[in-house]
Swiss-Prot record:
Primary site of residence: nucleus
Protein name: Replication factor C subunit 5
Record carries keyword Membrane: no
Induction text: By salicylic acid (SA).
Keyword Flavoprotein: no
Lineage per the UniProt record: Eukaryota, Viridiplantae, Streptophyta, Embryophyta, Tracheophyta
Gene Ontology CC, one term: nucleus
Organism, as annotated: Arabidopsis thaliana (Mouse-ear cress)
Length: 369
């Protein structure tokens, strides 16, 4: 007869650490960042402690205080991608468990494993065992990344697991859309919203990486990185690394200066000067000439119509025109962007853009008479 082992008799040191299932967010080891050239900068410069997390100091200080007082509740961190949610939880794990934190956390990506079976098996098995590897009974941590992608049945099952194993386990739920998480789970967690990073904090962190990698980036290039990332630090670091690799001259020991144009060309976004030129044509040239010129610059620089529409919409706010005309332009451009999202013909939609501006021009001229 097989001898059964109680969950309390299991030593976590004897359990093989689980391989985290995530979206490329590999857990960085305790200590200084790895120095391998092949390491993505997103992982190489991931914050190792709560003090290293950029921005959100009020949230970080609150979590730090709860950790110091041994009063850490279940957490629900939500907000746009690249704002430091996962990095914050991993920093908390390092602070709580030190070098043995891998044995004390279960990291799952709910986009990959989001069914009810994961909650009933993997999560419940991990939560039901108690660890004495740190010399005393200590709570463990379950990190559910992209929890908003879990099915409703899995979320209801998770609610019961959280209630049952609160004494031995803390749960940290991470998601982009809090409205996709059932109210029963939200009420069992302390919620923190991570807003997009502002330009000041992003610039400071990017300058740190630029200095560490010994890059040369112009002020305009840095501003372009901040603008294109829209508060997403992960996106900013990926763009910086891609631009560095694309602009690096193999014949020289040092990379050339990264400019605004390098950043825009690497990402495929239209340059601000190109948008100004296109807007000038739309507001001044006849239909046939404007169509020819915009088509030519679109083909020559490999621009996408949807990117042109987005940038022109932002540019409209900088132009002095009657409010009624501005409202009509934005409404028409929104319809064009909607049609483009369904794969409508680019040439037809380019004609629609020019027609929209031609009609707006006629209204402005008529009002001036």
């Amino acid at each position: 007869m097989t001898e059964l082992t109680s969950a309390m008799d299991i030593d976590v040191d004897e359990i093989q650490p689980r391989k985290p299932i995530n979206k490329g967010k590999d857990v960085v080891g305790f200590g200084p960042p790895p120095q391998s050239k092949a390491t993505p900068w997103v992982e190489k410069y991931r914050p190792q402690s709560l003090d290293d997390v950029a921005a959100h100091r009020d949230i970080i200080d609150t979590i730090d205080r709860l950790t110091n007082e041994n009063k850490l509740p279940h957490l629900l961190l939500y907000g746009p991608p690249g704002t430091g949610k996962t990095s914050t939880i991993l920093a908390v794990a390092r602070k709580l468990y030190g070098p043995k934190y891998r044995n004390m956390i279960l990291e799952l990506n709910a986009s990959d494993d989001r069914g009810i079976d994961v909650v009933r098996q993997q999560i419940q098995d991990f939560a039901s065992t108690q660890s004495f590897s740190l010399g005393k009974s200590s709570v463990k941590l379950v990190l559910l990344d992209e929890a908003d992608a879990m099915t409703k049945d899995a979320q209801f099952a998770l609610r019961r697991v959280i209630e049952k194993y609160t004494k031995s386990t803390r749960f940290a739920l991470i998601g982009n859309h809090v409205n996709k998480i059932i109210p029963a789970l939200q009420s069992r967690c302390t919620r923190f919203r991570f807003a997009p990073l502002d330009g000041v904090h992003m610039s400071q962190r990017l300058k740190h990486v630029i200095e560490a990698e010994r890059l040369v980036v112009s002020d305009c290039g840095l501003a372009a990185l901040v603008r294109l990332s829209n508060g997403d630090m992960r996106k900013a670091l990926n763009i910086l690394q891609s631009t560095h690799m694309a602009s690096k001259e193999i014949t020289e020991e040092e990379s050339k200066q990264i400019t605004e144009e390098d950043v825009y060309l690497c990402t495929g976004n239209p340059l601000p000067k190109d948008i100004e030129q296109i807007s000038h044509w739309l507001l001044n040239k006849p239909f046939d000439e404007c169509y020819k010129d915009v088509s030519e610059i679109k083909t020559r620089k490999g621009l996408a119509i949807v990117d042109i529409v987005k940038e022109i919409t932002l540019f409209i706010f900088k132009i002095k025109m009657p409010s009624a005309v501005r409202v009509q332009l934005i409404n028409d451009l929104a319809d064009i962007e909607y049609r483009l999202s369904f794969g409508c013909n680019d040439k037809l939609q380019l004609g629609a853009i020019i027609s929209t501006f031609t009609h707006a021009r006629s209204i402005i001229v008529g009002a001036a008479k």
